[in-house]
Amino acid sequence: MARALAKKKNSEVAVMDEDMFAADAGIGVNDLGTDDLAIPFIKVLQKMSDELDDLDGAKAGDIYNTVTKEVAKGKDGVIVINCAYTLQHIEWEPRGTGTGAPHRIYGPGDELPQTERGDDNKDYVVDGNGRYLERTAQHYVLVVDKDGITQQALLPMKSTQFKKSKQWNSAMRAIKMKDRNGNLFTPPRFSHLWKLETVSEENKNGSWHGWQISKDSVVLD
């Protein structure tokens, strides 16, 4: 027999009992697979970002989570743990056409199609009807909130930000720690917290907001 939900009278103040949910922790969500979930991306909002039309108070230079819809001010930044990295070449349809999804994704070791550099510095696929390849550094991170709770996210870095990715990888590899015997070793990439902020950038082609990455502290647990 179905259990009826208890209702409070209008004069009573409803108080949530977390233990009621804790007893059934994970039911209905733990069995979800990757095909059932959206991938959260962390991105810097730009002047022409569509999200600015829908997010109250958001502005160019803010940091946006595409799944939670959370916005962090660029000057405040977010804290992340960098867990993994891969380099991909993503083949895109011409702007304004297609579904907005990649035409094809090439991983490390995949044979890339022949390309020609266009006047806009994009690498266009030869006989690809305007499709172009974009070299993209994919950083798989855990975003850490002020309470220490983490959430998985993907942080792509391409175009003007690709250099930032290389610098970040170099900074992680340069970290040295000492073991109990005083011997130096290189810790894993997920050993430290990093702060991601945003800064204004420009070149002869225009201006935008990009990442500013700094080491925060070592992961304690």
Where are these regions (language model features)?
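OB-fold ssDNA-binding interfaces and closely related basic DNA-contact patches used
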Residues: M1-T150, N203-G210, D216-L220
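Polar/charged alpha-helical tracts
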Residues: K43-Q46, D50, S170-A174, R180
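Short secondary-structure capping micro-motifs at structural edges
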Residues: D120-G130, M172-N183
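Short, well-structured alpha-helical interface segments that form or flank functional binding sites
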Residues: E134-T136, T150-Q152, K163-S170, T186-R189, ...
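Short acidic, glycine/tyrosine-flanked loop/strand segments centered on an H-E-D-like triad
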Residues: Y140-K178
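Long, compositionally biased interface segments
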Residues: R173-D221
